[in-house]
From Swiss-Prot:
Residues 1279-1290 have a biased composition (Low complexity). Residues 9-25, 1264-1278 have a biased composition (Basic and acidic residues). This is Clustered mitochondria protein homolog. The modification Phosphoserine is found at residues 279, 281, 654, 664, 723. GO terms for biological process: intracellular distribution of mitochondria; mitochondrion organization. Belongs to the CLU family. GO terms for cellular component: cytoplasm; mitochondrion. mRNA-binding protein involved in proper cytoplasmic distribution of mitochondria. Specifically binds mRNAs of nuclear-encoded mitochondrial proteins in the cytoplasm and regulates transport or translation of these transcripts close to mitochondria, playing a role in mitochondrial biogenesis.
Amino acid sequence: MLLNGDCPESLKKEAAAAEPPRENGLDEAGPGDETTGQEVIVIQDTGFSVKILAPGIEPFSLQVSPQEMVQEIHQVLMDREDTCHRTCFSLHLDGNVLDHFSELRSVEGLQEGSVLRVVEEPYTVREARIHVRHVRDLLKSLDPSDAFNGVDCNSLSFLSVFTDGDLGDSGKRKKGLEMDPIDCTPPEYILPGSRERPLCPLQPQNRDWKPLQCLKVLTMSGWNPPPGNRKMHGDLMYLFVITAEDRQVSITASTRGFYLNQSTAYHFNPKPASPRFLSHSLVELLNQISPTFKKNFAVLQKKRVQRHPFERIATPFQVYSWTAPQAEHAMDCVRAEDAYTSRLGYEEHIPGQTRDWNEELQTTRELPRKNLPERLLRERAIFKVHSDFTAAATRGAMAVIDGNVMAINPSEETKMQMFIWNNIFFSLGFDVRDHYKDFGGDVAAYVAPTNDLNGVRTYNAVDVEGLYTLGTVVVDYRGYRVTAQSIIPGILERDQEQSVIYGSIDFGKTVVSHPRYLELLERTSRPLKILRHQVLNDRDEEVELCSSVECKGIIGNDGRHYILDLLRTFPPDLNFLPVPGEELPEECARAGFPRAHRHKLCCLRQELVDAFVEHRYLLFMKLAALQLMQQNASQLETPSSLENGGPSSLESKSEDPPGQEAGSEEEGSSASGLAKVKELAETIAADDGTDPRSREVIRNACKAVGSISSTAFDIRFNPDIFSPGVRFPESCQDEVRDQKQLLKDAAAFLLSCQIPGLVKDCMEHAVLPVDGATLAEVMRQRGINMRYLGKVLELVLRSPARHQLDHVFKIGIGELITRSAKHIFKTYLQGVELSGLSAAISHFLNCFLSSYPNPVAHLPADELVSKKRNKRRKNRPPGAADNTAWAVMTPQELWKNICQEAKNYFDFDLECETVDQAVETYGLQKITLLREISLKTGIQVLLKEYSFDSRHKPAFTEEDVLNIFPVVKHVNPKASDAFHFFQSGQAKVQQGFLKEGCELINEALNLFNNVYGAMHVETCACLRLLARLHYIMGDYAEALSNQQKAVLMSERVMGTEHPNTIQEYMHLALYCFASSQLSTALSLLYRARYLMLLVFGEDHPEMALLDNNIGLVLHGVMEYDLSLRFLENALAVSTKYHGPKALKVALSHHLVARVYESKAEFRSALQHEKEGYTIYKTQLGEDHEKTKESSEYLKCLTQQAVALQRTMNEIYRNGSSANIPPLKFTAPSMASVLEQLNVINGILFIPLSQKDLENLKAEVARRHQLQEASRNRDRAEEPMATEPAPAGAPGDLGSQPPAAKDPSPSVQG
């Protein structure tokens, strides 16, 4: 298995089959710079083919690229079906050995048609181990156990179960005939109105998973290592094998290859046994001695190479599954060996064994970045080292908590212990030496690592040359929080007091500064909005800082300038920090703030700071414009446009961020007034600052919005304001007062703008959260911390259109309950010994979710043993408290604690005392709550049907808890050039230039693959958009291929039931239908509906879209009754969430009417179409095309109804003998069904004349130039720390309706 985004070239080639084989770059002006038209330089990368001669098989051709390394051809051969059993070989060209690490273009004489000979090389111990590991990987290549166990970056995918393999030409294509009989019956549990929520269908058993047994046992022999005399005969190691025929054999791995020896389990005899067959490959030897192996191994490899490459490639970060079927534990020599060595990734392949993580992390940052190829190389190296470091840190953190690592201070109390393992430093999230005594003790110590990680993430994103941060990973495991950090060279040899040359080690009592640090941090202060400021130290001397006092600067022995302890990078959140004598604005007081939180490290999010500054910039422009209007009351100057010259005095923000309210009430709300204000703002922007009146205007506006400069808009925050123990000089009192006011305004802005804005967006379906994670994501995108969840829910409750926010309220309550339960679970687990873990977790789940009134915890059997022995065990792992207090918890007590926690932490009153009351009051589902708590805590449960509602027995037993995984937080390094390409492509698509957009997004895909390898969330978003574009441009096959990759990738990197995966399934179903693969389309839609039911339930706006899709496809295959069930459900849901007069509801009525027409039930059809017609007439007017279409259809229905009635009357008059031609009911054509599917999925093909098109493009280009002028100004002046992901950009969690994702003139949202 390949680790952490590594990908053999063969898989890359398959994975990138849709992409052109080239690598494109940008001009030096900077990525995505569209002002002069994006100049794309093509790096010539024409491939050529070489002939491969390998022993024992026919020669074959291989397409290669000059930029590939020789090593990548090795990897291709190790993956091919006919050469996969070889690992120890070299490639020869004209008798010369090719170097592993040289690029093909540098190999002399290598050209089109060259012959490369595969030559078997002698083994070493290392090569023999690699060979055995590779054979084991081949034998396990279809076995999903590594994915269920969450190891080696394996993860699950179930798409192939629903598509019968590949959807491309190679796979089993569905018949294209429209009227082919196909099985359309959905399972009972996914029908609208079904109360059943089974868990087993979540992970259907793939036919390939019942593995073909090639061998019973392959393991290292107990006779290892070979004695000295045998080493001198070339013996490297011994293997023990039991074949499928039950033959036990002992095998010698020697320098020349593998052969049978005469040893038995108890008798060592290394001499060769008969048949005397020496094979260079272990597989060839096993083929000789076991007919079953020979037959099954061949079948296994055939199946392996038939699987889609995206099902096999390792993901960059480990994804864990919260459920797993019961699996047999098979013997596995490689797994056993890995468990007892500190192998991380492929450690033993690297000289020097353990890696110097700090050196690797910092060296990759120092790589050059002047042009695109350099930046790609740098970003790929950063990403690779980072994913490796995260894997190593996670493994180390688990080893620390499990007690398998010796502490560096073993004599101290468990909580105070620190650890070093594999060159990584580990500390536990407890308040050691009362460091956080004034900030909330252990609670503050638990929160500090995540704040610090956010700081590291931010400084890494700003990426200032010469400033270094530590590799940081935060791991929550078994109730403990472990921080893993790379080690600054020399830090362990010195006291902290000596090391720190900038900042404070005691929260501001002693403070030092350093000119070099001030210079470096000054460069970050602009994008991070941090104010350079003075504080007083313990000797009352003024010290200048450009960060919070806790931020420490240490110069390592390597001469690098490191910053650490970045927990206060962002300003404090005053809503949760009561300060005696300070009053908050009225908006805060009205909402019940300030509220004392359990710690004093509450900070505003970076997104909030950015949104606040943007809001202030708008206010600044409006104030300045209003003053100009007053000055120019007599005569108005002609405004010059923003394009002509960038603003010299106004910086940083785009002209008109959507959705931001104006802060000033004075200006008129009429459109003409706003237009005037905008013109005047542009006048100021174009002014060069010489006009004294403009200077005066700008000075006044700067003062009003709190800018630190009087000549330019520049808002920054002092992160030390309101920090306990930090004092400011007398001379700065005015500045401090202004800064305090700014912080109060920011706190008020969060409550008065951001939270109402979020609720409004949810109401208008601009965002569609589906589960707790997507709700948290949309809150964070707006800078709203999760501690405000109670306030969000209160606002939803008070909203006039409360029922239209039912889905948000339900998700929010579920999130509030599971987060409160997680807080309790964390402390609960800390008191559990390792031997009691499954009993304790199953007891907690019973108390949390089971209706059984008094579950009894099963104490582990060894609790009954005398405890004298325990007195000797002073230094236990952190979890070994010998505490059975957990066993006495009751459901009543747990739910009382959950309600208390909800009140204390979120300030929300839950109206439930048991799980059943919670389900009844808030419409929650127990299976959804189980999923949410499992994902948040790392629990893995057995895949089976749980009887949550049984009052006679508890839902969970010890055997149902299979595992507990770590929950890992880490930095996500970005592929910046690829991201800019992606944004430029989106912009082109939105302007209607689909082909150009498609090319740019293809480029982005190439670059994403270059940096991240084949698997990544952002690559997934790229593939989704590419598929949509190909679909719009009529290339269904390409759309299908890209969307299949997007689904597989979403399953693998985000989770098989993640809301994004559900959306990807829906898109794929549409493209399958368009390609006449009807039964596959239905299978995919049924899967999406099942996942939606499991993750949320029935009553969600997204369910209306899903049911419309299902209903339409069923209508197309003439399953009218089934179709009506789904379409009528969609109509009910749409009516609830969009209101009875919405256009979506009119469309829903029309779809239902069409099915009734097909059933010849004209009265019902007329009734629904009339409803639709009324809505169109009211909303759009009688002359609108839609209204006219509906009117025509009504006439048509009326005529059919009259004709039917006439026929019926004829029958009544003349009896059955009447000679009446049979009524003709035609099935809907596939084209008409597809047309409706496109409409509901937000894809409209608008017929435009050439003139219309030209006018539209001219208008779009004009607007785009204005936007670009503003954007380029931002980019030139302010290298932003992080870009907010645009709709549908990488990072988008699928929380928006498809319509909002890819709008364009030809793709109407």
